[in-house]
A protein has these predicted regions:
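Generic recognition of short, well-ordered alpha-helical segments
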Residues: 61-62, 88, 163-166, 219-223
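N-terminal pre-catalytic segment of deacetylase/amide-hydrolase enzymes
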Residues: 1-50, 56-65, 69, 90-91, ...
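Short amphipathic alpha-helix with an adjacent loop that forms part of the alpha/beta core around
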Residues: 196-198
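Alpha-helix N-cap/loop-to-helix initiation residues
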Residues: 56-57, 82-83, 161, 213-217
Length: 249
C-alpha cells in the first residue's frame, strides 16, 4: 500500500491548511488547490475529462482494462517512482496510445509548497529549486518512458504555493487542476466513488487514482465511469485541449 496516497486516517489527522480568507502574509502564502473545468461544456452535450493519478504505488489494471474495453480515453499523471515500479502497467498504457496520455506528476511526489511542513504527512518541497527539480525531472522521466514531452503538471496532493505556480508555468507546463475529486486519495469505498463520478456534470475534470489495485475505490472508479458512458458522455484527454479549452474554478 502506498503510504503517500491519502487514507481516512491521514485526512482526519493531517493539520489543517491555513485558510485563504485570513489576512496577511500567512494567507497569501497558504497552499491552494486549483480547480479546473472544460470551457466548452454545455448542458445539452455531456463531456468530461477523466484524469488518473499514478503516485508511488502499483498499477490498477481493473481501471485500465475497463477503459480499454470501453474505448474511453484518460489522462494519466505519473511520477518517476511509479514508472520505475510498474513497467508492465506502462507497457499497457503505451500499447493504447489512442486512449492514454501520460502527463507529469513529478519525480518523487513532492508537493510544490514553499517553507517547512507537510501536507497529508508528505514533506513539501520547501523552496523553488526543489520545485523546479521535481517538475523538470518528472517531465524528463515521462519523455524518456513515452517518447512524448508532457504538457501538463499536477502536484502531489494537488496543493501548490501561490509563488510556485508561475514558476511551474514558466517551465512550460499547464497546471492541471480538477473540479471533481472522485476518491479522496483512493480512500473512499467503491459505492461512494461510483456515486461521485456518476453525478458529474458536463465540463467536469475528474481526478481519481490508478495506483491502488488492492483498495476498493478502484472498483468505484470503473463503475462511475461506466455510468457516465451510459449517460452518453464524451471523454476528452487534456493533451488534446488548448489553453482556451479549460477554465479555472
Amino acid at each position: 500500500m502506498c503510504r503517500l496516497c491519502l487514507t481516512r486516517r491521514s485526512l482526519l489527522a493531517a493539520p489543517a491548511l491555513a485558510p485563504l480568507s485570513h489576512a496577511g502574509a500567512a494567507a497569501r502564502d497558504s497552499p491552494v488547490e486549483p480547480g479546473m473545468r472544460l470551457a466548452d461544456a454545455t448542458p445539452d452535450r455531456m463531456v468530461v475529462a477523466v484524469t488518473l493519478d499514478a503516485c508511488p504505488g502499483d498499477f490498477d489494471a481493473r481501471i485500465a482494462t475497463a477503459l480499454v474495453e470501453s474505448g474511453i480515453p484518460a489522462t494519466i499523471f505519473a511520477t518517476d517512482l511509479w514508472l520505475r515500479r510498474n513497467p508492465a502497467g506502462l507497457a499497457l498504457l503505451l500499447a493504447h496510445r489512442d486512449l492514454f496520455d501520460v502527463e507529469n506528476h513529478g519525480e518523487l511526489h513532492i508537493p510544490p509548497v514553499l517553507g517547512p511542513g507537510t501536507i497529508y504527512g508528505i514533506p513539501v518541497a520547501g523552496d523553488l529549486a526543489t520545485v523546479r527539480r521535481e517538475v523538470t525531472a518528472g517531465a524528463a522521466s515521462i519523455s524518456a518512458a513515452t517518447g512524448m514531452a508532457p504538457r501538463w503538471y499536477r502536484a502531489a496532493t494537488g496543493y501548490y504555493s501561490p509563488a510556485a505556480m508561475p514558476e511551474i508555468e514558466r517551465l512550460g507546463f499547464g497546471i492541471a487542476g480538477y473540479s471533481l475529486n472522485a476518491d479522496a486519495g483512493a480512500s473512499l469505498p467503491a459505492r461512494s466513488v461510483a456515486a461521485r463520478i456518476a453525478r458529474a456534470t458536463s465540463g467536469e475534470v475528474i481526478v481519481a487514482h490508478i495506483n491502488q489495485p488492492y483498495r476498493p475505490s478502484g472498483l468505484g472508479v470503473v463503475a462511475g465511469i461506466m455510468a457516465l458512458q451510459r449517460r452518453g458522455a464524451s471523454f476528452v484527454r487534456l493533451d488534446r485541449l488548448g489553453a482556451t479549452d479549460v477554465v479555472p474554478v
